[in-house]
Structures are given as structure tokens and as C-alpha cells.
Amino acid sequence: MQVSVEATQGLERRLTISVPAEQIEKLVKDSLQREAKRARIPGFRPGKVPITVINKRYGAAIRQDIMGEVMQRNFIEAIIAEKLNPAGAPTFVPGSTDGEKFEFIATFEIYPEVELKGLDAIEVEQPKAEVTDADVDTMIETLRKQHATFAAVEREAADGDKVKMNFVGSVDGEEFEGGKADDFELQLGSGRMIPGFEAGILGHKAGEEFVIDVNFPEEYHAENLKGKAAKFAITLTEVQAANLPEVNDEFAALFGISEGGLEALKAEIRKNMNRELEQALKANVKEQVINGLLANNDITLPKALIDGEVNVLRQQAMQRFGNQTANMPELPAELFTEQAARRVKIGLLLGEVIKTNELKAEDERVQGLIASMASAYEDPSEVVAYYNSNKELMQNMRNVALEEQAVEALLKSAKVTEKEVAFEEFMNKATGRA
């Protein structure tokens, strides 16, 4: 085998590989002989079909298969010999056979050489927060509202009330599609409706008929309503006030607390809040570290890796649509290219961090991650056992652990400052509720 390597553009490499023609001819001949022994052709006894007949019938297909195998096998030998690391599957272009050699071209991309830079220039503001008694009380109030019962009242509608109504919406005096409803139920203050709609109902009583003026947001999903002024003619049929449950042992029982009553519920709530806080703090620091790493390191990305990541993201997006995908056109790659490129770049850079620091997933950390995740389930031990018995899930958790270790390694050289933050403020920002 003879090999020549050509750097075409960027990360693309072109291998020209020559293989002795006699090698292919021998493989073809051997394959034809094997086929002759098992072929069943009318007019010939089993195992007695002449090679010329087999060649006429199957020769072209056999030769094509052999050439494919030869190209694949010799390509692998060539990249090992040339110390090349392909970032994707090669494209093979078979050339001619001159009687002495068979030549083919393999084109592919290689992984870029990554040299980490600017690690000491990464700036991280590390938030410090804790769950206080007041935070637990706030969560209990949220849970009370979620378990509220409602009863009709003869008074003006107030924030937090549920109302029932009939309404008809119009733009420029014309009703629009989707702007009409009967027996519509709405909790005031929920933010379900466009700005101004809920506020326009406050202060009105059941039985009243009135009109409110609102404006559809510029980013509204219906193109014909974006930014439009609208009127809604409303008939308020019922106002219901919330009755919140008392905070006692009976309230705790609503959440499956059979022993310990209210204090046990508070302890469980605090544990869950601490778990969520720890995850959010980690995610916040990780995002800052990753953003700093990306900003300080510009690398050429293999198109093959980006294309592969685009396909993964597209498949995930299609799965989120569920059963609605039957008649949907394929989502364009452009929707995912930027996110895919970011993910590929992060993977390459963190891979180099792991390699440079000779990191290996710590078993104790892996088990800690599994235990933390399992604690959110009714039977944590069952979840832990399931993960430990599943190779794929365990590999995923090892990857998560390695990523954590890589971020921690980067933090050692980063410029880190600490900042005290309140639990509620931090969690609202982390979950996009700020």
C-alpha cells in the first residue's frame, strides 16, 4: 500500500491510496469460488456452477463489494500509519485500475489541534446563597395557593380571585378568530392573558358587562394581531375567592408526610430547595467558566461534527412535537447551526482540559450525582440501583462528573470573586422569572 497525504483546505485532508491490483483480483476470485459452491442455478448441479457463469451473474456486484472493503480497510491502516484523527466518515472516490495497482481517494476532516489559552483571564462571579427560614415560609405560601379552594363571592374581583366570563374581542370593529369564549375561567394575576386584560377585570362584580381596551404585543404569535389595539366586550358571570388551607399537620399530609407533621414537611421542603439551589449555583458558575473559555479560545471546527450535532438537535426538536410530526417538513439546519457549533466547540475545549489535567471520572462523585438526582424520587434506592445496572446511564453520569471536574480545574486558574445573593432573587434569575 502506498499513501500520499494532501492538506486541501482548513481541516480537510485528502489521502491517495494505492493497493496492488493482484490483491483485489485474488479477493474477487476467492469470493467467486465461494459463491460457486453455494449458488443454486437451474441446469447445474449444486456446487458445480462454472466460475464463468458466476462471474457473469454476480461478478460486478462482488467486485464492487470487495473494492468497498479494500478501501475501508486500507483507509484505516493509512490513518493509523499517518497518525491522522478523522472527525467524521470519509468520502471514497475509486480510481482506475491500471493492471498493477488500484488507486482511490479518501477525503475527510481531522480534529483540530487545541491549545488552551487565556485560562487565567476567565472571570467568574461566584454566587453564595443559602435557604433561610423565610424562604421556606415563602415556599409554603406558594404551596398553600396551589392547594387553594375557591367559592363564589358577592364583591368586586381582586387579584388572586378566579373569575368566569364570556367575552368577544374585536380589532377595528371586526371580530377576530380565537377572540371569543363562553364560560372562560381565569385566575387574576396569573399572567395568562395579554397585558391589560386581567387588570381590566379588577374591580368589577359578577353580572356586570363592560369593555376593556388592550394592545397585542409586537411579538404576539398571530401575525394579524401583532401590535394591534383591540377591544374586549366582557360579561362577568362569577367571582370566586380563594380559601387557603391552614398550615398544620393536615396540610403536611397533603404532600405525603405521614409522620412528623408540619416540621417534617418543612424539613423536606428545605432539603428540596437546597438541592435545587446547589444545582443552580453549579450551573451558574459553569456557564460563566464556559463562556470565558469560549471567548478566549478560537478554534476551527470540523463541519462533520457540526452537521452531526445539528442532526441530534433536530431530532430532539422533532421529538418534542410528538405525534404532530407526521406531515411536518424537515426543520432546516440553519435553526440549529449556531447552537450545534457552540456545543462542538465546548466539547473540544473541555476535552482538551480533561486531557491536559489527566482527569478521570471519580467514582465517589459519580455516585454522589446519582444519589442527588435519585433523592427527588419516592424510592431513591430503586433509582440508584437502576442507574448502577445500566451501562449507558452510568456512562452518561461519568461524562457529567468529568465535565464538573473540568470546570473545577478551570476555576483554579480563573479570577474568582464571591457575591452574596438572596435565595429568591438568585433562583428567580436562574429560572428566568426575574
UniProtKB/Swiss-Prot annotation:
Enzyme class: isomerase
GO cellular component terms, A-Z: cytoplasm
Protein's cellular compartments: Cytoplasm
Chief subcellular location: cytoplasm
Any one biological process term the GO annotation gives: protein unfolding
InterPro entries cross-referenced by the UniProt entry: PPIase_dom_sf (IPR046357), PPIase_FKBP_dom (IPR001179), Trig_fac (IPR005215), Trigger_fac_C (IPR008880), Trigger_fac_C_sf (IPR037041), Trigger_fac_ribosome-bd_bac (IPR008881), Trigger_fac_ribosome-bd_sf (IPR036611), Trigger_fact/SurA_dom_sf (IPR027304)
UniProt KW keywords: Cell cycle, Cell division, Chaperone, Cytoplasm, Isomerase, Rotamase
Catalysed reaction, written as an equation: [protein]-peptidylproline (omega=180) = [protein]-peptidylproline (omega=0)
Record's comment describing the protein's domains: Consists of 3 domains; the N-terminus binds the ribosome, the middle domain has PPIase activity, while the C-terminus has intrinsic chaperone activity on its own.
Known role: Involved in protein export. Acts as a chaperone by maintaining the newly synthesized protein in an open conformation. Functions as a peptidyl-prolyl cis-trans isomerase.
Protein name as annotated: Trigger factor
Originating gene: tig
